[in-house]
UniProtKB/Swiss-Prot annotation:
Organism of this sequence: Saccharomyces cerevisiae (strain ATCC 204508 / S288c) (Baker's yeast)
Binding site for ATP 1: G878, E879, S880, G881, A882, G883, K884, T885
Gene: PDR12
Side of membrane Extracellular, spans: 530-548, 619-622, 679-765, 1204, 1276-1291, 1340-1444
Additional observations: Present with 752 molecules/cell in log phase SD medium.
Cytoplasmic membrane side: 2-508, 570-597, 644-657, 787-1182, 1226-1254, 1313-1318, 1466-1511
Function: Plasma membrane transporter which mediates resistance to water-soluble, monocarboxylic acids with chain lengths of from C1 to C7 by active extrusion of the preservative anions from the cytosol. Also involved in the export of aromatic and branched-chain organic acids produced in amino acid catabolism.
Stretches assigned to the ABC transporter domain: 144-397, 836-1084
Keywords: Acetylation, ATP-binding, Cell membrane, Glycoprotein, Isopeptide bond, Membrane, Nucleotide-binding, Phosphoprotein, Repeat, Transmembrane, Transmembrane helix, Transport, Ubl conjugation
Name listed for the protein in its UniProt record: ATP-dependent permease PDR12
Modification Phosphoserine, positions: S32, S52, S56
Transmembrane segments: 509-529, 549-569, 598-618, 623-643, 658-678, 766-786, 1183-1203, 1205-1225, 1255-1275, 1292-1312, 1319-1339, 1445-1465
Record lineage: Eukaryota, Fungi, Dikarya, Ascomycota, Saccharomycotina
């Protein structure tokens, strides 16, 4: 038992001894319990009262938490003999009560273990592949026929391999199995195979036995008893911890419960019990959160995942790398929580953990070791080390067992373990030799006997009967016997609905933004169409505007549902995980969305309708108004489920958005407004039958115009010469007009204009109801087939022509030795001692850092001092929140807020101007451009960060040296990629270090948590490289969180902090940590064991461990210690002796950037071009969007005729083309955001290049690709529509649309992104601005009909006004009008006159022509001669085309300027209200930039030139 366990148990004992009252209450309750058992308790629950007795008082909760910590340290074997005194604590009574009452009442727990033999998993051999690029995209397209042929002939050319093979083992109920293996060893595949999650594999072979049942039967009938828990925590971030756990428990509440508890009692009691055990009770009301939503901590989120999994009441749990990203303290708490669960409810746990400390390893009962997919050990955990020691390997002192077992699986040439003398030729060297040794060992034979014994002890029929009973007792009444789900379908829907309302409540910000967007847009639309007509009399002048407003409102209500695609993909990982847990049908989640989303959408539609109906003076009838609401609400629901259906059908968000954009275009074009039904081509007209907007638009328009009599606004003929003419000889110039009638019937108008009829209104609503339910059914059915996101190991992506030879088991080359490192960094034949003696020394003293916090201030660092000498590695340690990273950032001058005071000196002098350029900083997050190769990333850093005087060839030579030193030769041409498809964690960390090394940091190298997330061997490799780097003369300051003993002893010096940024120790570590341990053993009175990790020991001493507690203030102990006095004296001595040493203050290093501006442009432009070229998904999505949408528009308007309607169609088609730009801008935001994040996180802080270079280069390359896309748009739109082929027309359209318009929308899109905090915000701003520009450009509402304010301001400001004018004119210029029959104005001349005589005066003053001048009745007058006259009423003129061209250049220049200025103001400058109001400072001095970190921002305090403050 460890010292921690002893302290916990002593603490429990001492508490019970001094608390007789509580012990008496326990005894009284136990006595009463014996009486209560004999009474009828059908109406009450003994367990409920028993738990309430424990959990209702603070002492009970504290004892339960303490005892849970003791149990979490016990293995299954130790638990069998573990006894708890009833007077000490009543958890024993609780545990015994739970199990005994289950058995007494005939409740079958359903426990099960697992055994497997010769398990082999076959998968696709994907250890390396060619990296993505546009070239590879075309290669894949060209290879499609070959793939189809291979599928047809059933000859697959996909290489296969055994991911794991010949694995055998037994895990009994209540046992924990520790899976050891490096990344790529097959640990994840091993866990998935045992859990039945094998959909990603080609084949699974071997024997499985779940207490006798084979895997097929277990997965088909009892899937809920076996759970695979992925390494990532997928939860709905906006709901609370209590709501998350309650939902899981409700879905798994059994029908038969102990003591006939109600469902609510069961949920409340079990939740309180587990959350008390796992320390989550204080988080009940806190949101779960995620990486982007603030909530509980990462460790608490892991425990939420554990409680949720325990709520499943399963028998076998597989935890895949569950502690990745957690510090060692949190990882220990997590492992202890799993141990507690197995001991309390007798389930089994199979766990894979990286960098497991000895205290974690000791919790496990059994261990298996995997080496390149081969099993090389399975057996008791406490015998694993001995097995490999007998093999011949030597385990160093203080190396943890897990670290030793992992080290054994390293390739022989990189293996650092010693071999026993005489065993050099006996030990296995490769994975196949290890496997052969294992299969021939006595331990393997013992395992086979254990397997056979397990099989004999668990007859199949007995297990089947037992699990059948357990399952029947769990299934809710009415649930199918063979169902995998505990509660029935409608109960699932009900619980999902409750959670849905909780999600809506938790995400109130989204709801507010959603409703606000409807309110703002409604106000804009309402004011834009204000007083279409006078309330007392409608006129034909407002008819078009009335239809345009209805169409725009309908379009807005529908297109907002496009956000359903993003929402669907954000929630998919969570609901797919729940499906794998057998919690509920995915269709139940789909159904609940109908109910939970409806209130918000209903309120939004009501807001929209109230404003857009009454302000524009629509029909003043209550019935018409409520029909207006009904039609809009129905079509919104229908389109919402259309986009949900698109998301369900798609595998990725990129594909879904591309298809969704095409759907939007179809909905717009075939709604009946921009392309009337009568003008649709017969071969494509069927689209309007499946378009819900068609039915909704007809219902809206027909209801609005029904029984409306519109006074004619323009009679033909009229004007001079026709003053006294009779109405019998005139006709209204409006669709549906009847000669001789001053009024136009609304029903007649919509019939001739749109081919609509009022009698279809309610039929259309019924059709949309059918469509809505149809899409609901499609979505519900398809959602049941959603599959989890495909996973897999790290896949290296190589540039074509640089793929390494197949068959290598490891892609890493040997890391350089100390001698090679010294020669590469300092040159050959150098005197290392002299080099170190001449290097600068960095010191800091009396360092404080204070930040504003909640209206007050908080001190994060308090009186910190220390130094870093050349050739030494200094570790910076402390518990989470102690201020390690904060101190590192302060020393590296990467802080831009708060106040810093103290001394930071180089050679006892103020920091030189070259300080920033002389230091390197390796951040914890490995941020690199995914599309670059390792060599290209290093060359890019070298070109821009080394001095400009260094020749390019010399920079590249140095890059090759760094590649060799880091052992990256084998993957130097591999792309960085994303996690899982690209470099693994270790390779990324090496690249991060390499990027800083190629900059040649002559003074200091800062590293923040360089071993975080690595397995033990990878962490050892990184620290060994750092050690070699330090031995060559480099100064290193590194934060590290609870390293293993072997890693810890590589450091020379330690600076230890406690919470509040207070120092606890600074000094040498000493050989075998003797110097450090001597101090802490003296202060604490506790000895550090020989096998104990010194790093964990000192953290437990100061109270930083998972269960440690202290009574002394270690900061005060340190200040009073002689070690502190000696350390301060050392700092003072350095300050006294170092001033005579010269400081390297090269003037070239004093500049902020090493490279010139033009060099920065050249390098960044080249890198950006590579980024685009190697992003085929983005390029493919752009081209698909452009080609598909433009072709759709072109074919919809194919062969536009010479009629009046043809001119309007040309006008409307431009409206459709503008919508394509909206989709491209949204795609642009997502892609450009990654580059912005990379720059701001890493490159800006390291002064790699100026921020404006990023903006201009990205705009240039984005414009190039967008221009190619626009060219395809032109081809697919212009020629199918058969517009004018004259060079002056087609050439101008091409010039403007292909060459000028992309410049506009690219610079506009980047401007919006670069001033926005994130992509969703950018998309929201863009959609509102874009919609406003479309609304005010004159298409939906002609300029003359706009209110004066909008007409004078927004019409002239909207850039789309000039885009539309410029693009429409070449389509209609000089195109003769040939009116269709329904477009003629037909009237009768006065008696005795011909049509020509009657209309001659009118035609002299107006445009148009007369078809039958000699006729004496039914004069057919076409009001236009050429289509220019048709569009002239929209203020579109051919003579304005070059003016519009000039205006667009003005807008482009404005966008570029706005992009630069807004980025500078929003993301570069550090603003405060005081500085903004200080106008004098605006003109007299430069301000500090957010990304700038040069030392002139430090201001000296009068009287002390070395004292610095920073605000």
């Amino acid at each position: 038992m460890s010292s921690t366990d002893e302290h916990i148990e002593k603490d429990i004992s001492s508490r019970s001894n001094h608390d007789d009252d509580y012990a008496n209450s326990v005894q009284s309750y136990a006595a009463s319990e014996g009486q209560v058992d004999n009474e009828d308790l059908a109406a009450t629950s003994q367990l409920s009262r028993h738990l309430s007795n424990i959990l209702s008082n603070e002492e009970g909760i504290e004892r339960l938490e303490s005892m849970a910590r003791v149990i979490s340290h016990k293995t299954k074997k130790e638990m069998d003999s573990f006894e708890i005194n009833d007077l000490d604590f009543d958890l024993r009574s609780l545990l015994h009560y739970l199990r005994s009452r289950q058995l007494e009442q005939g409740i079958e727990p359903g426990d099960s273990g697992i055994a497997f033999k010769n398990l082999t998993a076959v998968g696709v051999d994907a250890s390396a592949a060619y990296g993505p690029s546009v070239e590879e995209m075309f290669r894949n397209i060209a290879s499609i026929p070959a793939h189809l042929i291979s599928k047809f002939t059933k000859k697959s050319d996909v290489p296969l391999r055994n991911i794991i093979q010949n694995c055998t083992g037994v895990v009994e109920s209540g046992e924990m199995l520790f899976v050891v293996g490096r990344p790529g060893a097959g640990c994840s595949t091993f866990l998935k195979c045992l859990s039945g999650e094998t959909s990603e594999l080609v084949d699974v072979q071997g024997e499985f036995s779940y207490d006798g049942l084979d895997q097929s039967e277990m997965m088909s009938k009892y899937k809920g008893y076996v759970i695979y828990c992925p390494e990532l925590d997928f939860h709905f971030p906006k709901i609370t911890v209590k709501e998350t756990i309650d939902f899981a428990l409700k879905c798994k509440t059994p029908r038969v419960r102990i003591d006939k508890m109600t469902r609510k009692q069961y949920v409340d009691n079990i939740r309180d019990m587990w959350c008390t055990v796992f320390g989550l009770r204080h988080t009940y009301a806190t949101k779960v959160g995620n990486d982007f939503v603030r909530g509980v901590s990462g460790g608490e989120r892991k425990r939420v995942s554990l409680v949720e999994a325990q709520a499943m009441n399963a028998s076998i749990y597989s935890w895949d790398n569950a502690t990745r990203g957690l510090d060692a303290s949190t990882a220990l708490e997590f492992a202890q929580a799993i141990r507690t669960a197995t001991n309390m409810v007798n389930n089994s746990a199979i766990v894979a953990i990286y960098q497991a400390g000895e205290n974690i390893y000791e919790l496990f009962d059994k261990t298996t070791v995997l080496y390149n997919g081969r099993q090389i050990y399975f057996g008791p955990a406490d015998k694993a080390v001995g097995y490999f020691q007998r093999m011949g390997w030597v385990k160093p002192n203080r190396m943890t067992s897990a670290e030793f077992l992992t080290s054994v699986t390293v390739d022989f040439e990189n293996r650092t373990l010693d071999i026993k003398p005489g065993y050099e030729d006996k030990v296995p060297k490769s994975s196949s030799e290890f496997e052969e040794y294992w299969l021939n060992s006595e331990d393997y034979q013992e395992l086979l006997r254990t397997y056979d014994d397990y099989q004999s002890r668990h007859p199949v029929n007995e297990t089947r009967d037992r699990l059948d009973v357990a399952k029947k007792q769990r299934l809710q009444q009415g649930q199918r016997e063979n169902s995998q789900y505990v509660v029935n379908y409608w109960t699932q829907v009900y619980y999902c609905m409750i959670r849905g309302f909780q999600r809506v409540k938790g995400d109130s910000t989204y709801t507010k933004v959603y409703l606000s967007s409807f309110l703002i847009k409604a106000l804009i639309i309402g004011s834009m169409f204000h007083k279409i007509d006078d309330k007392s009399q409608s006129t034909t002048a407002g008819a078009y505007s009335r239809g345009g407003m209805l169409f725009y409102v309908l379009l807005f209500a529908s297109v907002t549902s496009l956000a359903e695609i993003g929402n669907s993909f954000s929630s998919r990982p969570v609901i797919v995980k729940h499906k794998s847990y057998s919690m509920y049908h995915l269709s139940a989640e789909s159904l609940q969305e109908i109910i939970t989303e409806f209130p918000t959408k209903f309120v939004a539609i009501v807001i929209l309708c109230l404003i857009t109906y009454w302000i524009p003076f629509m029909k003043y009838e209550a019935g018409a108004f409520f029909q207006y609401i009904l039609y809009l609400l129905t079509v919104q629901q229908c389109t919402s489920f259309i986009f949900k259906f698109v998301a369900t059908m798609s595998k990725s968000g990129v594909d879904a958005h591309a298809v969704g954009g095409l759907w939007v275009l179809m909905l717009c074009v075939y709604a009946g407004f921009v392309l009337p039904i009568g003008e649709m081509h017969h071969w494509i007209r069927w689209l309007h039958f499946i378009n819900p907007l068609t039915y909704a638009f007809e219902s809206l328009v027909s209801t609005e115009f029904h029984h409306r009599e519109m006074l004619c606004s323009a009679l033909v003929p009229s004007g001079p010469g026709y003053e006294g003419i009779s109405i019998a000889n005139q006709v209204c110039d409006a669709a549906g007009a009847v000669k001789g009638n001053l009024y136009v019937s609304g029903d007649s108008y919509i019939l001739h204009q749109y081919h609509f009829a009022y009698k279809h209104a309610w039929r259309n609503w019924g059709v949309n109801i059918v469509w809505t339910f149809g899409y609901i059914v499609f979505n519900v059915i398809l959602s049941e087939y959603l599959k989890p996101v495909e996973g897999g190991g790290d896949l290296l992506l190589y540039k074509r022509g640089h793929m390494p030879e197949l068959g290598t088991e490891n892609a890493d080359a040997r890391t350089a030795s100390r001698e090679e490192m010294m020669e590469a960094l300092n040159g050959p034949n150098v005197d290392l001692e002299k080099v170190i003696a001449e290097k600068d020394v960095f010191t800091w003293n009396h360092l404080d850092y204070t930040i504003p916090y909640d209206g007050a201030t908080r001190k994060l660092l308090s009186d910190v001092f220390g130094y870093v000498k050349p050739g030494k590695m200094t570790a910076l340690m402390g518990e989470s929140g102690a201020g390690k990273t904060t101190l590192l950032n302060v020393l590296a001058q990467r802080i831009n807020m708060g106040v810093i005071t103290g001394d930071m000196l180089v050679n006892a002098k103020p920091l030189p101007a070259s300080f920033n350029r002389s230091c390197g900083y390796v951040a914890q997050a490995d941020n690199h451009m995914a599309e670059l190769s390792v060599r290209e990333s290093l060359r890019f850093a070298a070109e821009l960060r080394q001095q400009s005087s260094v020749p390019l060839e010399e920079k590249y030579e140095y890059v090759e040296k760094i590649i060799t030193l880091l052992g990256m030769q084998n993957y130097a041409e591999a792309l960085v990629g994303k996690t899982g498809r690209g470099l693994n964690v270790e390779q990324r960390k090496k690249l991060s270090i390499g990027v800083e090394l190629v900059a040649k940091p002559s003074l200091l190298l800062f590293l923040d948590e360089p071993t975080s997330g690595l397995d033990s061997q990878s962490a050892w490799s990184i620290v060994q490289f750092m050690r070699a780097l330090a031995d060559s003369g480099q100064s290193i300051l590194c934060t590290i969180h609870q390293p293993s003993a072997t890693l810890f002893e590589q450091f020379d010096r330690l600076l230890l902090l406690k919470k509040g940024g207070k120092m606890v120790y600074f000094g040498d570590i000493g050989p075998n940590s003797e110097t450090l341990l001597k101090y802490f053993e003296r202060q604490s009175g506790m000895k550090c064991g020989v096998s104990e990790n010194p790093a964990e020991y000192i953290l437990n001493c100061i109270g930083a461990g998972a269960t440690a507690s202290v009574n002394s203030d270690w900061h005060d102990l340190w200040l009073a210690s002689p070690e502190c006095a000696a350390a301060r004296a050392e700092v003072e001595e350095l300050h006294r002796t170092l001033p005579g040493r010269a400081v390297n203050d090269d003037p070239e290093l004093a500049t902020r950037f090493a490279a010139s501006y033009m060099t920065q442009i050249k390098c960044v432009l080249r890198r950006t071009a590579l980024q685009f070229w190697r992003s085929p998904v983005y390029i493919r999505a752009k081209f698909f969007e452009c080609v598909a949408c433009a072709l759709f528009v072109g074919l919809s308007y194919v062969g536009v005729n010479h009629s009046v309607g043809g001119a309007i169609e040309a006008f409307s088609s431009i409206f459709m083309l503008l919508l394509i730009a909206l989709a491209m801008i949204n795609q642009l935001h997502v892609f450009a955001y990654d580059s912005r994040e990379l720059y701001e996180v890493r490159e800006a802080a390291s002064n790699t290049f100026h921020w404006s270079v990023l903006l201009l280069c990205h705009a240039a390359v984005e414009n190039f690709w967008s221009t190619l896309c626009q060219f395809m748009c032109f081809i697919c739109y212009y020629w199918p529509a058969q517009f004018s082929g004259r060079a002056s027309h087609a050439g101008f359209f091409f010039f403007f649309y292909v060459l000028i318009f992309p410049l506009y929308f690219v610079t506009y899109g980047l401007w919006i992104l670069y001033m926005s905090p994130d992509v969703p915000s950018a998309s929201m701003i863009n959609s509102n601005l874009f919609a406003a520009m479309l609304l005010f450009c004159g298409i939906l509402q002609p300029r003359e009909k706009m209110p004066a304010f909008w007409r004078r301001l927004m019409y002239n400001v909207s850039p789309f006004t000039y885009v539309v004018q410029a693009l429409v004119t070449p389509l209609v210029h000089n195109k003769k009008v040939v009116c269709n029959p329904h477009e003629y104005n037909i009237m009768d001349p006065p008696s005795g006159k011909t049509c020509g005589e009657f209309l001659s005066t009118y035609m002299d003053n107006n445009t148009g022509y007369l078809v039958n001048p000699t006729a004496t009745e039914n004069c057919q007058y076409c009001p236009y001669t050429v289509q220019d006259q048709v569009v002239a009423k929209y203020n579109v003129k051919w003579d304005h085309r070059w003016r519009n061209f000039g205006f667009m250049w003005a807008y482009i220049c404005f966008n570029i300027a706005a992009m630069l200025i807004c980025y500078y103001v929003v993301r570069v400058k550090v603003w405060s209200l005081k500085s903004v109001l200080n106008f004098k400072k605006w003109f007299n001095g430069p301000r500090k930039e957010r990304h700038e970190k040069d030392t002139n921002i430090f201001q000296t305090v009068p009287g002390d030139e070395n004292k610095i403050t920073k605000k």
